[in-house]
Amino acid sequence: MLQQDFITIQLPKNELVIMPTSVLTRLHQYRQLKFWHKEKGGIFLGRYRGQYIEVTDVTLPQHDDICGRFFFNRCSSLHQQTAYQQWQNSNSEITYVGEWHTHPEQFSTPSTQDITEWQSKLSGSFESMLLCIVGQSTDWFGCFQDGVISKETSSSLTSCPQNYQL
């Protein structure tokens, strides 16, 4: 098995997100570094394994998505189709585990619009949902659980979390 680097993100309520750095690298390709760059986004796919949320893949921006300098609206059905295909191909193990999008700011934080949309979209979720805003320099990670949005408590780069079997 190939050695792979992961980022681990500690969420409130003792949950840990495990994400290959290759996924984060793909997101960073959409950073809004120039004034003409528009917000982009997609969804996280992965599995829930006890206290872990394992991110396995991500959907990337699609042509049908609506975006501007300060807004992103995921409209393309390809995000849903990709999630459904991975769910089918994994015997219902891989599923939608969260959302990501970019912001045109050095140190990203959720806007009032982000919070309102997440509360509206995710209010029926039974599991914790991973949230990410990709900034120009740093990324904001958080989760939506039980109607509450919380920021991650820490993140680090590791080869593989202790006591975790891939």
Residue ranges and their predicted role:
Residues 101-103:
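Histidine-centered divalent metal-coordination motifs
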Residues 1-96, 105-166:
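Conserved beta-strand-loop surface patch within small alpha/beta domains used
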